A protein has these predicted regions:
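N-terminal phosphate-binding or glycine-rich loops at protein starts, especially the Walker A/P-loop
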Residues: 1-47
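Glycine-rich phosphate/nucleotide-binding loop
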Residues: 117-144, 224-228, 232-341
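Glycine-rich phosphate/diphosphate-binding loop of Rossmann-like nucleotide-binding domains
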Residues: 18-20, 32, 36-38, 43-44, ...
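Phosphate/nucleotide-donor binding subsite
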Residues: 55-100
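Short, glycine-rich nucleotide/cofactor-binding loops
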Residues: 7-19, 149-159, 300-305
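Short beta-strand segments
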Residues: 10, 39-40, 62-64, 105-107, ...
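A short helix-to-beta-strand connector/capping loop
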Residues: 56-62, 207-209, 294-295
Length: 342
């Protein structure tokens, strides 16, 4: 029998809370029997949302009442310290105390990043936990690491990102010997800023990863690499541009297919193929971005996430747990640290 995974969902985080997180929780426990969802937030508000649903396994949704909410504009470090009874802090503490295996939130990115490191804690040997979302490509998906957690990363941090990303892609996505590339302004080794130039030789010499060199932004959608390594500023720009282009592309296609009678007739013929193609550009299909290298599972979804994205993030947590991703990353980093000490 499969292990039951307890996933905390921040019911108060995001633009569409509490309706969408609660809906996601109901859908998740209805679809799968190996999940218990713990909703953190104001109990009366959550119960009111739950009352809108019927015929779901109520015994697998729990509520932990909290009295505070961390807003997006609040300074993250101060908010984590001051708002001990917030839905984010309480949820992360449940993971820390091993009363849950994972935490999912659409709330304040800064608070989740700070709280993940301060409350849940980094695995031994991990210097900087990166945010690592999957992005669609012509060949499937690639992992973009880091996309927002470490703006001032150093070369050794990027090397660790490459290692963690390789473990993720091999064990979660199932890609053997995943290709690792560093984002650069050209394919040549001598190109790039100081960070890229210092990191490149370290990645070349790094055992255990399949480093293929630099990748330019235009080649990312083609799927030339499985693990895309960069510091957070670059990664976040790539991610936001990717999502913006995907959204615009979908709107343009829909508008073009509806502009006249001839186009509408043609649309009926190609609708199934277009629908399937457009689905691959929908960020909600890929769940959230895990904060890798922690002692517990923490996944950040978009602030505007709907139930479908949050539900997929919950399922993501189950897969992470089953594949023991955190344990594998921790073991690799401890092995690396021990090797250096020796």
């Amino acid at each position: 029998m499969a292990e039951t995974v307890r996933v905390v969902v921040d019911a108060m985080g995001g633009d569409n809370a509490p309706a969408e997180p609660v809906k996601a929780a109901v859908e998740a426990v209805t679809e799968r029997e190996d999940i218990i969802v713990i909703l953190t937030g104001r109990q009366d508000v959550i119960e009111n949302e739950l009352s809108k649903f019927q015929n779901y396994p109520k015994e697998r949704i729990q509520i932990v009442n909290t009295s505070e909410v961390i807003e997006t504009a609040e300074p993250p470090v101060l908010a984590i310290r001051k708002k001990k009874d917030s839905s984010i802090v309480v949820g992360l503490n449940l993971v820390k105390k091993q009363e849950a295996e994972a935490f999912v939130s659409s709330g304040s990115s800064g608070a989740i990043l700070v709280g993940g490191q301060v409350i849940v804690g980094r695995s031994k040997g991990v210097q900087r936990p990166p945010l690592a979302p999957l992005i669609p490509t012509q060949k499937g998906v690639s992992l973009l690491i880091d996309c927002g957690a470490n703006v001032d990363a150093r070369p050794e941090h990027l090397v660790q990102f490459a290692k963690m990303g390789s473990i993720y892609m091999e064990d979660v996505v199932g890609i053997k010997n995943p290709r690792v590339a560093i984002v650069n302004i050209g394919a040549e080794e001598e190109k790039g800023n100081a960070l890229v130039k210092e990191t490149f030789p370290l990645l070349k010499e790094c055992p255990g990863i399949n480093f293929i060199g630099s990748i330019e932004a235009r080649d990312i959608p083609a799927g030339y690499a499985d693990v895309i390594v960069c510091e957070a500023f670059v990664g976040n720009v790539i991610l936001k541009l990717y999502e913006g282009l995907g959204s615009t592309f979908m709107k343009m296609i829909k508008t073009g297919l509806m502009k006249d009678t001839r186009s509408k007739v043609g649309a009926l013929l190609v609708k199934p193929a277009i629908k399937e193609t457009l689905k691959t550009f929908d960020a909600s299909e890929y769940g959230g971005a895990p904060l890798l290298g922690l002692k517990g599972l923490v996944v950040k979804t978009h602030g505007s996430a709907r139930a479908v994205e949050i539900r997929h993030a919950i399922f993501q947590c189950v897969q992470f747990r089953q594949q023991k991703i955190n344990e594998k990353i921790a073991a690799h980093m401890v092995e690396e640290t021990t090797g250096k000490e020796a």
